[in-house]
Structures are given as structure tokens and as C-alpha cells.
Amino acid sequence: MFETPRILFEDNHLIVALKEPNLLVQGDSTGDQDMLGLLKAYIKEKYEKPGEAFLGLVHRMDRPVGGLLCFARTSKAAARLSAQIVDGTLKREYAAVVEGRAKENDTLRDILVKDEQNNMVRVVPGYLKQGKQAVLSYHCAALREDQSLVAVKLETGRAHQIRVQMANAGLPLWGDNRYGKGKPGQQIALWGMRLSLSHPITGKQMVFVAPPEDKGIWTGWRKELEGLAAIWPQIVTLG
């Protein structure tokens, strides 16, 4: 059972909270707990709201992944935050441990197609004229034997994007048993660590940084993780 997510910021317009790994963002056919439902229950109880509380889902995160997510508390905030997703002013940056030795800097551009029936995403050649373009840039922050700690900046937001693109580049995420060499029970080494946006009403620039807990695969990377906050703003899209 999951508890109410840790909330980093809350006002009348939005909530920024931490998603635990393996918690659904939104309910599905499994009937398992989901973050949206937990936060709606929290709002309903805290503010004694009759009926179901409104909470708009602004962006998503794969179930095995943890990290920062923002939600809109009004329809106006939802529309404005969604517009920031489209124009790229709402930025989502991730920390990941990948298998292999990553380049110092790289930009990956691929065309992705999702198999809805199997919930799998694959890279396809561009000439097939199907699928959606996916772009991300990364910086290798540290190397350790056959593993790399990378800071990833998303340019687009496709399903399973980081997992699929990094695996296609020969750098599968540690613990990813869907697209990599992960084993059952391993926790995928992908964490939404930095979120930057403009407040939907005041326009104030807001930046949130929350590293993963020092456990599992993240143990031993603490010093390098602390240095990532200064790296993301410097990552540029190559080519």
C-alpha cells in the first residue's frame, strides 16, 4: 500500500509531488493504487471538499520510475501547464544509471512506435513514415567500471522514451527488465530529479530538485548525484 505522496509545493493552482517507484500515475485496468487518486483523496480530506476533487494530470511517468511530477488544481492551470509542455518551457530532467560507457554528451533522435496490446515501444526507421519523433539529450556525469551516471534532458515526452532510446543506443538502463538486462525484483535506475516550470498564474519561474534515496543502485552515487543540479541547465541539443 502506498501512502500520500510527499508534496514539495502546493497552492491553489498546482501541486508538485514525488512519485514512488512502481506507483501508477493514473488508474488503469489493474485497479492498483495510483498517484492521481491518492492526491485527490488528500485534497478532498484536507479542504473538506464535497464530491471528487479536481486534479489535472499534466505529464506522465512510467510505473517503475520515481521522481517529480506536477498536477494542476484548476482547469486554467491545467491548460497553461499543458501549453508549457508543448512549447518546452516545462522541463523534465532525469538521473539514470546505464549499462556501458556513455559519451560525454549526446543527443538521440529516433522515431518510436508503441504496441498498445503489449505495452512495448520500439524504434523504427524514419522512412516508414509512422510513429512519433523522440528527442533527448544527455550528459555523462560519472563512469564506474561498466556503468555510467547520466543526466537526461527530455525534448519530447513519449511513452518509455528514455528507456527505449538509451537501450537503442547500446546503453540500457540498469534494472530495466523490459528493454534492458534487468532481473525480476530489480528497481530500474531512472529518477525524475529536476522539474522546472513557470507558475501558471503568477508566471514566476520555479525549479524543483529531489534526488533519489540513497539505496539500491543509487548507493554510492550520492556525490555525483548532488552535482547534477548544476549540469542540466548546461546540456545543449547537439546537431
Place the predicted regions along the sequence by residue.
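RNA pseudouridine synthases
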Residues: M1-G239
